[in-house]
């Protein structure tokens, strides 16, 4: 109906009202586009002027410096609305962890790592810095240490220590294989696993259950050796490193003399509490040398410790059955990898008599800066040695012992 008249007119079988509706719809769409085009002429913000962001414009960033006693504040510049502006990257809670990702040469050290070192040193933090390309970070860390020590910002008694397996003349010595760092068999197993995984860095995963069996066997055997040497003929020491006297009694099973738990001062004979215990051969050089002994000698020595005896079951069975191929598969893998660690530098740094500092770097009574140096050309060897130190250090700090 249109003005009271029926619309019976048709055009190619289409009613006239449908045709008028289509014409009106098309005209409406055209008019809307014309209106939007006219509106865009009044917008002066340059809409779609740089649709592919060739100017590298970013979003509006934080321009307020949020600072507290733990924060790290990194200045920055960003481009927004046609001009460069200044802002701040404020890491208010560093204890949550900060993950820095970037390609080589992208400026990670300059933009993130160095501000962390500079500001944490000024705020009196103890630090552990892993210098991947020594001395890139070593010189900066030592500079800020001396600067803030002069200004009185470094905690009193804080020392600067360095571990360097390449230029040992710069290095101090430390012994991570001792009872104060490895106090049970689980800690020995974790240490052994960390060391072997670091030596096998870059090896492709896979190989089935047989490879996993030999890998686990190597870890268990190394853990047994570590724990044996940590506890073999342990002697007590006081906080100053002076030896104390431990009363002993004979074990009826092994016929060995073992401590009773009573410790006395050598001078006055008074009962005292030792600061730590140290095995007679408790260090990495003795363990590496021990692994090169004959199987019979190794088993005869390790069997004297009842705590490590359960780990030796598969090895002793293979040895008694003269399954030398299986035994070589279980222990030979360990010997091949650990033989690469037997260098004069590692023997000197890890020797029992050269424990120059404690890995409790965050101890309020004895804080320190520790720089661990690395050389990319010898990373496969040095990285494993450094991993051994870091494993014991991180475990000690995270358990509240540091």
Predicted regions located by residue number:
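P-loop NTPase motor domains
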Residues: 44-48, 91-402
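Basic- and hydrophobic-enriched, low-structure N-terminal and domain-boundary segments
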Residues: 1-106, 110-115, 123
């Amino acid at each position: 109906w249109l003005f009271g008249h029926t619309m019976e007119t048709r055009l190619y079988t289409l009613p006239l009202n449908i045709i008028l509706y289509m014409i009106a719809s098309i005209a409406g769409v055209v008019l809307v586009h014309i209106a939007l085009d006219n509106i865009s002429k009044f917008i002066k913000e340059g809409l779609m002027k740089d649709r592919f962001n060739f100017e590298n414009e970013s979003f509006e960033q934080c321009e307020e410096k949020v600072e507290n006693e733990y924060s790290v504040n990194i200045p920055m510049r960003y481009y927004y609305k046609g001009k460069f502006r200044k802002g701040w990257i404020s890491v208010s809670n560093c204890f949550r962890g900060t993950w820095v990702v970037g390609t080589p040469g992208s400026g990670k050290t300059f933009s993130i790592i160095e501000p962390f070192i500079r500001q944490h040193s000024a705020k009196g933090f103890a630090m552990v810095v892993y210098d991947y390309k020594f001395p890139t970070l070593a010189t900066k860390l030592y500079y800020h240490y001396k600067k803030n020590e002069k200004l009185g910002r470094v905690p009193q008694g804080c020392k600067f220590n360095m571990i360097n397996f390449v230029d040992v003349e710069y290095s101090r010595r430390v012994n991570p294989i001792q009872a104060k760092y490895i106090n049970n068999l689980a800690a020995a197993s974790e240490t052994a696993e960390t060391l072997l995984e670091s030596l096998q860095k870059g090896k492709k995963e896979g190989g089935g259950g047989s490879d996993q069996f030999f890998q686990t066997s190597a870890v268990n055997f190394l853990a047994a050796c570590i724990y044996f040497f940590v506890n073999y003929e342990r002697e007590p020491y006081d906080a100053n490193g002076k030896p104390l006297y431990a009363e002993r009694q004979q074990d009826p099973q092994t016929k060995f003399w073992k401590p009773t738990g009573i410790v006395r001062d050598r001078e006055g004979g008074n009962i005292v509490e030792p600061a730590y215990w140290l095995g007679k051969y408790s260090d990495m050089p003795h363990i590496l040398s021990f692994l090169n002994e004959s199987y019979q000698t190794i088993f005869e020595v390790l069997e004297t410790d009842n705590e490590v005896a359960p780990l030796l079951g598969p090895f002793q069975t293979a040895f008694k059955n003269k399954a030398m191929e299986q035994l070589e598969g279980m222990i030979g893998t360990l010997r091949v990898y650990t033989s690469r660690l037997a260098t004069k530098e590692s023997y000197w740094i890890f020797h029992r008599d050269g424990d120059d500092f404690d890995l409790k770097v965050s101890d309020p009574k004895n804080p320190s800066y520790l720089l661990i140096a690395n050389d990319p050309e010898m990373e496969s060897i040095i990285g494993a040695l450094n991993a051994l130190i870091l494993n014991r250090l991180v475990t000690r700090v995270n358990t509240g012992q540091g």
